[in-house]
Amino acid sequence: MQLIQIEKAILPTPWGDFLIFGFEEKKNGKNHIALVYGKIKKNIPILARIHSECLTGDAFFSLRCDCGIQLEMAMSRIASEGNGILIYHRQEGRNIGLLNKIKAYSLQDKGLDTVEANQKLGFSADERDFSLCADIFNILNIKKIRLLTNNPFKVDMLIASGIEIVERIPIIVEKNDKNAHYLKTKAEKMGHLLFK
């Protein structure tokens, strides 16, 4: 187990009250959170979303990506179903960090795509480790999930970490003139299942 649970509290949102759980990585003290809505029922697959941190999309409403819209869609869907979990995965910029993400944005402004920009900076296309999320599911005694994702890598890593995914539910964001190239790159180079 790479994480320990630190605390939980009520988090009122526009979609209702969630419980917010705080976790800490044992090796480096990095924090992660999970938002739980409603009751977790043993042996019943729960709707789940792993949302990777994206300050630019989540807090500043950037149109370069689909992150902020996906966060809102996931919280709304979880609340409308009556229960679910959203893990806020603190691995900004596909785990290259905020400042490197800004450098990658600058390279994208010069014509590189999101994968090429990461590689130019010395990173792989996706540096994230979703095994931390499996630890959160295990700490909260969640064994079976219905996963809101377009990312087959996320599905594979969770299954390899012992989480049973009974259904993959797409979370599709409409293209706009700012994110169309980014979404196309995610589909073509990273295998994301973005189009109906």
From Swiss-Prot:
Task: Quote the catalytic residue positions.
Answer: D126, R128
Hey, what's the signal peptide range on this chain? Answer: none
Q: Which InterPro entries match?
A: GTP_cyclohydro_II, RibA, RibA-like_sf
Instruction: List the molecular function annotations (GO) for this entry.
Output: GTP binding; GTP cyclohydrolase II activity; zinc ion binding
**Positions of GTP binding:** R49, I50, H51, S52, E53, Q70, E92, G93, R94, T114, T149, K154
Keyword check for GTP-binding: yes
Q: Which domain of life is it from?
A: Bacteria
GO annotation, biological process: riboflavin biosynthetic process
According to its UniProt record, which cofactors does this protein need? Zn(2+)
The pathway that the record names for this protein is: Cofactor biosynthesis; riboflavin biosynthesis; 5-amino-6-(D-ribitylamino)uracil from GTP: step 1/4
Q: Which reaction does it catalyse?
A: GTP + 4 H2O = 2,5-diamino-6-hydroxy-4-(5-phosphoribosylamino)-pyrimidine + formate + 2 phosphate + 3 H(+)
The alphabetized UniProt keywords are: GTP-binding, Hydrolase, Metal-binding, Nucleotide-binding, Riboflavin biosynthesis, Zinc
**One Gene Ontology cellular component annotation held by this UniProt entry:** cytosol
The EC number(s) attached to this protein equal: 3.5.4.25
Cofactor binding summary note: Binds 1 zinc ion per subunit.
UniProt binding sites for Zn(2+): C54, C65, C67
Q: What does this protein do?
A: Catalyzes the conversion of GTP to 2,5-diamino-6-ribosylamino-4(3H)-pyrimidinone 5'-phosphate (DARP), formate and pyrophosphate.
Q: How does it assemble?
A: Homodimer.
Family per record: Belongs to the GTP cyclohydrolase II family.
What is the protein name for this chain?
A: GTP cyclohydrolase-2
Q: Write down the species.
A: Buchnera aphidicola subsp. Schizaphis graminum (strain Sg)
UniProt lineage? Bacteria, Pseudomonadati, Pseudomonadota, Gammaproteobacteria, Enterobacterales
